Amino acid sequence: MKDSEKISHTRVDSKNYKNPLCCRKIIEISSRSNRSVKELKSLLTGRGIKRHGKTLVSGKKIVSELIRFNPDIILGWISSAGSVFLPSPVLLDIPCYKVTKELFRELDIHGTGYPLLVVKVPECVPYQENKISDNVILMIAFQDPLNVGAVIRSAAAFAVTSIVLLKEAASPFHPKSIRAAGTTVFAAKFMEGPSINEVRSIDRSIIALSPQGIDINSFSFPERFVLLPGVEGPGLPPGLHPDFMVSIPMEPNVESLNASVATSIVLYEWYRLKR
């Protein structure tokens, strides 16, 4: 047994669920130095997510959807001391981490107050352009997990399924990214790509965004292309020369759009024109 960790089994009140009474494993944790706590807290970082192959999911809507549609990826759930309850009978045989209120608040970074899920992160396959049949590839180098999540959601909405995560990109399974993307992040298939400095394309045009680019309203999208928004702030590296640069018209008193918003507009315009 790990330090400061108490394992017990409790019975579920049949008044709450129609299924028979069942034992449930509860792991009670009170110490901040506990190894389980350290691992759970590391899942709030991209490095910890990659190391352990797990992440944390919060929010009643997302938690409920995962329980309903993706129960196989759920490894555990976390509840605050004094308020342990089952969000669903699906979790009856899945371990529950019962932590102190203070620790729960640290893990529940969005302040939902609802039980958290510990879920398995899908593996990313290496990027190989010649094995992708889709005409459009989205390459993400965003370093803000909120932007990563937002653009993944937009990609799903506009039928872009080939998503390459460049080395600069934040984890799409960071809790902030999941919050922005919703459950679409668990349906997406990601590929691990090179650094943005090394991006090349075999048979697709590379399209980037720039205020000095072609007005998107008059731009004709090639049949096959790579959309490469760049990194927030710096944009594209000096050595990268895209085939096309497109711009989004806006009021002159606005300096620029958020990176994920601008990318979403381009994806929508392509989607609208191809329909």
Annotate each language-model stretch with its function:
Residues 115-119, 156-158, 169-186, 238-275:
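Structured adenosyl-cofactor binding patch, chiefly the S-adenosyl-L-methionine
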Residues 208-254:
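Active-site/ligand-binding-proximal alpha/beta "capping" segment
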